Amino acid sequence: MTLTSLRAAATCLLLAAGAAASLPAHAGKTLDGIKARGLVVCGVNTALAGFSVADTGGKWSGLDVDICRAVAAAVLGDGEKVKFVPLSTSQRFTALQSGEIDVLSRNTTFSLARDASMGLHQTAVTYYDGQGVLVLKKSGIKSMKQLKGQTVCLQSGTTTEKNLLDYSKTHNLAIKPAVFEKVEAATAAYFAGRCVGYTTDASGLASVRNKEAKDPSEHVVLPELISKEPLGPMVRRGDDEWFAIVKWVVYGLVEAEEYGVTQASVDRLKTSSTDPVVQRLLGTTEDMGKLLGLDRDWLARAVRTTGN
């Protein structure tokens, strides 16, 4: 899905709102539980720069964190009413399936197997990534094709290993994966010289290079991306109302960006905009929130909390 089609989907809902305005949603089990406890419980990465990182005071920040805060603002009226649960790769799906968390917002790739066989729903893409490889600049390696017969470190329990093996087979490279259960072990092995390269999503490679390398300039990401990795929040199957809420919070933030509704301008535009789409978006002329079991200001609060 392209950004254009994502925006088109969001616009479609907004423009069709009037036709369905007489069909308010019924709150689902997940939303009922959230309202009862007064918190959205959100599973995030233990530490991935740009996506979810806690500072020394325990304050979380990053794209995945902002999605959780936007959802909390929409459903509870306060973007701070979130409990962040840091999860490893092996823990993330079990935590969602068991009900330990309400939403998984943890740089997780959408795939057919995950959507069809794990009892989970993929909501909306928040970041389009692709798998790459990090190597030492002094190795002289400038292309994936130069990894023929070499060992590449990676973490288990992700789409990474299969992508690497598929690429290796297609291009007859005989790349040897060195698989580690924990990402820290995989990156440590790479920096210790046990592998010629380290592979994961390109966003993760940037984080590893900048955060863990003694001298980031000594490492380069090869130009090829060997996969498509659409990342976004996931929820449990069986609660369509909650699925719709998380999905349309994301779509609403995208729509807000397209129409110039920002954290700084949302309050002004809510009262002064003459654009009919913006008026619907912010609940000025139509109560779209009731279609999701929310109030009319749900999206205005989300934008006010995290921006678009």
What are these regions (language model features)?
Residues 1-13:
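Bacterial N-terminal signal peptides that target proteins for export
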Residues 66-69, 73-75, 138-141, 145, ...:
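Extended ligand-binding regions for polar small-molecule ligands
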Residues 35-36, 72-77, 97-101, 109, ...:
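Sec-exported extracytoplasmic/periplasmic mature domains
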Residues 41-50, 60-75, 109, 129-185, ...:
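Bilobed "Venus flytrap"/periplasmic-binding protein-like clamshell domains
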Residues 69, 73, 77, 81-146, ...:
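Acidic, polar ligand-binding/catalytic clefts
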Residues 27-30, 35-105, 281, 292-306:
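Extracytoplasmic small-molecule ligand-binding "clamshell" domains
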Residues 82-94, 177-192:
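Short helix-initiation/N-cap motifs at beta->coil->alpha
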